[in-house]
Amino acid sequence: MGRLFGTDGVRGVANTELTADLAFKLGRAGAFVLTEGTHKPKILVGMDTRISGDMLEAALVAGILSVGAEAICVGVVPTPAIAYLTRKYKADAGVVISASHNPVEYNGIKFFNKNGYKLKDELEDRIQSIIENNFEGVPSPTGENLGRKITCESAIDDYVEFAKSTIDVDLKGLKIALDCANGASYKTSVETFRELGAEVVVINNDPDGVNINKNCGSTHPEELMDYVVKQGCDLGLAFDGDADRCLAVDEKGNLIDGDFIMTICGKHLKDQGKLKDNMVVVTVMSNLGLSLAFDKENISTIKTKVGDRYVLEEMVKDGYKLGGEQSGHIIFLDYNTTGDGLVTGLQIASIVKETGKTLSELASIMTKLPQVLVNAKVPNNMKDIHEKDAEIAEEIKKIEEKLNGCGRVLIRPSGTEPLVRVMLEGENQEELDKIAHALAKMIEEKANA
């Protein structure tokens, strides 16, 4: 068996790749590894709104109970809520059943340790090796030593109270549009903003099990961009299916992506003396415009590989407070141990309220360089073809010479799907489009030859 865990837990098409059998095994092995030596350990279990969530939850919980651990089921909540509530409830671990921004047929299983952090590779490998070794040495308790399933009704309220505590102002006088992606934030985000006094209008908050992320949310913000202008809102916020990411829309209907959000929040934290070492952790995918804007503000950046886990590792290592990705995974380490869409949205809204500036005015400190991202479909075992194939390497070198220091080429494999992402940055959008599509086509043809 290849490595089960990708960049963000175990992902796959539910019922064919991520089967009930595999969910049971992950529950059993995960509970064993994460709670060794604990008497009657407690594991928190939450999920997003996908139809396959019920099937996978039943199997996962069965696995947890089979090693004598208790499963505390909190139902549909955002991924960051599990990270927070695992700490608050003093659970021994947390598990989320979600495939985040992926289409409905996918699902995933992601573990958090008792401190609310995603697992390190070594722990994931231990879980996998227990499954591969047929649960050798894993107990099968009987009678009173089996685990119980406990349903927890207070999770949403507890998470909303936590989210509200991350800002010091009320939001009265602001009109805010929310796009909940028919996902896990459909209750929490609406309740939080309303309780803080904002006038809230909402789209895509009617999940039916199959409409999660469908032409909505942070992966498809076009509807929200129109809606903000039509409704005369001060800003809009788009979450993804499990609400660990958030993108914003300004009052003119312009998209404010994660790079803009980090620039706005980074400057605000620095002005308040709250940005440790005036440092923000970003990834190699962040726009060059972000670095230029931060240079003007005397803010430094550290660049990591793509993936919020790598951003988080760097932040934890040196205690940095702000980090994130262009996609809207923003981590405010003072508040939560993972990307948190609701906390991110609240920081943006509070800065608009505190400064009295419009979001478009706040965003004007950064000018985005044209950036083109094209997916090339390649088999999983060919994701490194751009490094191995001499013709592709030569083509990339030519493109970089052409961009002449005012842009760059970045090719990176997806951690969750059979594709590589071809990213070009430079000054001329039209030219970049042509070059990126031609390069993606070349990679696709060679990888599938």
Curated annotation (Swiss-Prot):
Catalysis: reaction(s): alpha-D-glucosamine 1-phosphate = D-glucosamine 6-phosphate
Phosphoserine PTM sites in chain numbering: 100
PANTHER family linked to this entry: PHOSPHOGLUCOMUTASE (ALPHA-D-GLUCOSE-1,6-BISPHOSPHATE-DEPENDENT) (PTHR42946:SF1), PHOSPHOHEXOSE MUTASE (PTHR42946)
InterPro entries: A-D-PHexomutase_a/b/a-I, A-D-PHexomutase_a/b/a-I/II/III, A-D-PHexomutase_a/b/a-II, A-D-PHexomutase_a/b/a-III, A-D-PHexomutase_C, A-D-PHexomutase_C_sf, A-D-PHexomutase_CS, Alpha-D-phosphohexomutase_SF
Protein family membership: Belongs to the phosphohexose mutase family.
Binding-site positions, Mg(2+): 100, 240, 242, 244
Record's protein name: Phosphoglucosamine mutase
Cofactors (names): Mg(2+)
UniProt-annotated catalytic positions: 100
Record's GO cellular component terms: cytosol
EC number from the UniProt entry: 5.4.2.10
Listed Pfam families: PGM_PMM_I, PGM_PMM_II, PGM_PMM_III, PGM_PMM_IV
Coiled coil regions in record: none
Post-translational modification: Activated by phosphorylation.
Function: Catalyzes the conversion of glucosamine-6-phosphate to glucosamine-1-phosphate.
Textual note on the cofactor: Binds 1 Mg(2+) ion per subunit.
A GO term, aspect molecular function: phosphomannomutase activity
The gene coding this protein: glmM
Keywords: Isomerase, Magnesium, Metal-binding, Phosphoprotein
Superkingdom classification of source: Bacteria
GO biological process: carbohydrate metabolic process; peptidoglycan biosynthetic process; UDP-N-acetylglucosamine biosynthetic process
